[in-house]
Curated annotation (Swiss-Prot):
It is found in: Fimbrium. The gene is ecpA. Induction: Negatively regulated by H-NS. Positively regulated by IHF and EcpR. GO terms for cellular component: pilus. This is Common pilus major fimbrillin subunit EcpA.
Length: 205
């Protein structure tokens, strides 16, 4: 989780933050009777506290996709996040956007198989090629669950709000190049990777 403050442009103060979610997904293997197995999963972990940056975005949890044989596909996941901003008393408008940065999971073996994760915000696809508007007070977009930010962007204190993206597996390959149309043809195993979403906040004076 990182926060980066960009320089001023005219009278606009623009800040971006990148929310990084580590993702694991896998296909299950049926076990025969009287066979036992044990596995140990280890997570690398860090802890961070940041209550001073102009914009802080924190993912609230991780993502885990499971293959379901009955639908020949993977389940979708709701990924919650927390947004905190510092108010600017000189601001007359506020805008918050998001953009997909990375979304590829790679299988943890020699197959090279990949899965791509799609990100959706309130019915709008979060893409790499353009910004998804989450708040735009100048045009009456007040952010739904993020509305406390639309109301507090020009306050003298910090304001927080929580919302979520919907994550789903939208495409895959068997070897990194050959696309699959039927997920049941994917190799067995576990895919791992990061889904990164960049948030940009602009205070206009």
């Amino acid at each position: 989780m990182s926060s980066i403050q960009l320089g001023k442009k005219s009278n606009e103060k623009k800040v971006l933050a990148i929310a990084l979610v580590t993702v694991f997904t896998g296909t299950g293997v049926a076990q025969a009777a009287d066979v036992t197995a044990q596995a140990v999963a280890t997570w690398s972990a860090t802890a961070k506290k940041d209550t001073t940056s102009k914009l802080v975005v924190t993912p609230l949890g991780s993502l885990a996709f499971q293959y379901a044989e009955g639908i020949k596909g993977f389940n979708s996941q709701k990924g919650l996040f927390d947004v905190a901003i510092e108010g600017d008393s000189t601001a007359t408008a506020f805008k918050l956007t998001s953009r997909l940065i990375t979304n590829t999971l790679t299988q943890l073996d020699t197959s090279g198989s990949t899965l791509n994760v799609g990100v959706d915000y309130n019915g709008a696809t979060v893409e790499k090629t353009g910004d998804t508007v989450m708040i735009d007070t100048a045009n009456g977009v007040l952010g739904g669950n993020l509305s406390p930010l639309a109301n507090g962007y020009n306050a003298s204190n910090r304001t927080t709000a929580q919302d979520g993206f919907t994550f789903s597996i939208i495409s895959g390959t068997t070897n990194g190049t050959t696309a699959v149309t039927d997920y049941s043809t994917l190799p067995e195993g576990i895919w791992s990777g990061d889904v990164s979403v960049q948030f940009d906040a602009t205070w206009t004076s």
